[in-house]
Amino acid sequence: MEKFILNVEKRERTGKGIARQLRSKGIIPCVIYKNGQSTPVQIPTKELYTFMNIATREKLFVTLKLDGQEKQAILQDYQVDPVTGKLLHVDFMEVSATEKIRVTIPVVLIGEPIGVKQDKGVLQHGISEIEIEAIPEKIPGHIEVDVSHLEVGDAVHVSDIKFEEGIKVISNPEEVIATVTVEEEEAEVAPSIEETVEPEVIKKGKKAEEEEEK
């Protein structure tokens, strides 16, 4: 797992009003969680954005420097403004270098399937994350899955992924990561009313709403 260092300061005052004041000064309110306990802290916006640009794509093991001590942690959650997209709040989970933790890591598909290149198939994406359990230093930032060998009708499941020793997979092994299907034929011109089928429109996406500051 890639490592990152952030300098943090304790937050003596909390609340929405205080949080807004901090953000106006270029500081983001954050919280460090450990064993059910929480420590309000703050981090300079610029420094935190540099970390977040990587952490939202990779699972990062971060060192938080607080009061002369170093705490090892991972990104647990974050909130953004639903209108501006600006970062509002970040939660970290303090971890032990020797204790196993459960995290989800992103799946990255690489390669172009044979079934797509040669047979005009369509690559369908399944789950985008896999849950694993391991000590922090064993946790990869992401997992790459080569789909170039897939023909039409083939699929890659969680059980097909080979992790290094010391990593336990928690996700359902039968979950589909990717599959290649037959391309749907275009509808005939001027179909009869009985044959007309309205296409289904699937919209994905969810904007995080600001939670009440702790």
From Swiss-Prot:
Record keyword Ligase present: no
Q: What does UniProt give as GO cellular component?
A: cytosolic large ribosomal subunit
UniProt-listed GO biological process terms: translation
Give GO MF terms, alphabetically.
5S rRNA binding; structural constituent of ribosome
InterPro entries noted in UniProt: Rbsml_bL25/Gln-tRNA_synth_N, Ribosomal_bL25/Gln-tRNA_synth, Ribosomal_bL25_b-dom, Ribosomal_bL25_C, Ribosomal_bL25_long, Ribosomal_L25_dom, Ribosomal_uL5_bac-type
Whether Ribonucleoprotein counts among this entry's keywords is: yes
Q: Where is this region: Disordered?
A: 187-214
The UniProt entry, under CDD domains, shows: Ribosomal_L25_TL5_CTC
What's the superkingdom here? Bacteria
User: Which PANTHER family does the record associate with it?
Assistant: RIBOSOMAL PROTEIN L25/GLN-TRNA SYNTHETASE, ANTI-CODON-BINDING DOMAIN-CONTAINING PROTEIN, RIBOSOMAL PROTEIN L25_GLN-TRNA SYNTHETASE, ANTI-CODON-BINDING DOMAIN-CONTAINING PROTEIN
* Function statement: This is one of the proteins that binds to the 5S RNA in the ribosome where it forms part of the central protuberance.
Q: Which family does it belong to?
A: Belongs to the bacterial ribosomal protein bL25 family. CTC subfamily.
Subunit comment? Part of the 50S ribosomal subunit; part of the 5S rRNA/L5/L18/L25 subcomplex. Contacts the 5S rRNA. Binds to the 5S rRNA independently of L5 and L18.
Q: State the protein's name.
A: Large ribosomal subunit protein bL25
- What is the species listed in this Swiss-Prot or TrEMBL entry? Thermodesulfovibrio yellowstonii (strain ATCC 51303 / DSM 11347 / YP87)
